[in-house]
Amino acid sequence: MVKETVTVAKTCSHCGHNGHNARTCLNGVNKASVKLFGVNISSDPIRPPEVTALRKSLSLGNLDALLANDESNGSGDPIAAVDDTGYHSDGQIHSKKGKTAHEKKKGKPWTEEEHRNFLIGLNKLGKGDWRGIAKSFVSTRTPTQVASHAQKYFIRLNVNDKRKRRASLFDISLEDQKEKERNSQDASTKTPPKQPITGIQQPVVQGHTQTEISNRFQNLSMEYMPIYQPIPPYYNFPPIMYHPNYPMYYANPQVPVRFVHPSGIPVPRHIPIGLPLSQPSEASNMTNKDGLDLHIGLPPQATGASDLTGHGVIHVK
């Protein structure tokens, strides 16, 4: 039995034709070139090397557009642009953009005002409503940040270690916040009320009323003085008259005058000095009612009286 040998024609990997291989192919790419030890040797002028570095998160079809963008940014070197991007395994250690990304990841510490607002929201809304606390009380933080801050706060409170620890923002507890609010309310209630602006300045007596001051100074004559009836004029003496141009002898009842002592002691009422104009008529009526006459002279000598009775004697009828 004779074995038949079957010869299979070789197919070129470059052009796809049979009868030759890629090394001896004269069609397409390897025209006028020879491949020696895996390297194509061609008589064509030397071209700039193509950048074949693998980009991260990019498809191979967009490499040309990316190179054009890198050249337009001013780098001018496509190889340097590819090296700057790096690979996935490199991370952001050797990348120029790594420092910026690392700074963005760095958190911003909480301030004391934010922590106190967090305590107020925790007191009103309770545990678990981190979204409501972030929305209504700590608007500068996200709900995730509020939840993380609350977790650290409760861990700090539950630690029973009595060793000296560094002062932290979490040492401000909810009881301290309530005590601060209570002290602020007490301070606001102790402030004196504002007096209305008027033309007359009122006396300021702190902690004492007028009755208390009067009781304290009981021995002083603080009552109103009684008004006595003036003496009527006799024997055509002119009565005391008012002098309108002199302020001592009259008082204007239309304008009340209030005197205030610096110690707060009330001052007695002002009493006008003088006599009314209708006083002479009242005095004449009083003289008519009394009926007293005063005569000075020698009395009439009675008959049969001794000389001892002849001396000057004043008789009142």
Curated annotation (Swiss-Prot):
GO terms for cellular component: nucleus. A zinc finger (CCHC-type) spans 12-25. One of its GO terms (biological process) is regulation of DNA-templated transcription. Residues 77-111, 173-206 are annotated as: Disordered. Its main location: nucleus. Residues 130-154 bind DNA. Keywords: DNA-binding, Metal-binding, Nucleus, Transcription, Transcription regulation, Zinc, Zinc-finger. Residues 175-184 have a biased composition (Basic and acidic residues). Residues 102-158 form the HTH myb-type domain. Residues 94-108 have a biased composition (Basic residues). PROSITE patterns: HTH_MYB, ZF_CCHC. GO terms for molecular function: DNA binding; DNA-binding transcription factor activity; zinc ion binding. It is found in: Nucleus. It comes from the Eukaryota. Residues 185-206 have a biased composition (Polar residues). Probable transcription factor involved in somatic embryogenesis. Acts as a positive regulator of BHLH109. This is Probable transcription factor At5g61620. The lineage of its organism: Eukaryota, Viridiplantae, Streptophyta, Embryophyta, Tracheophyta.
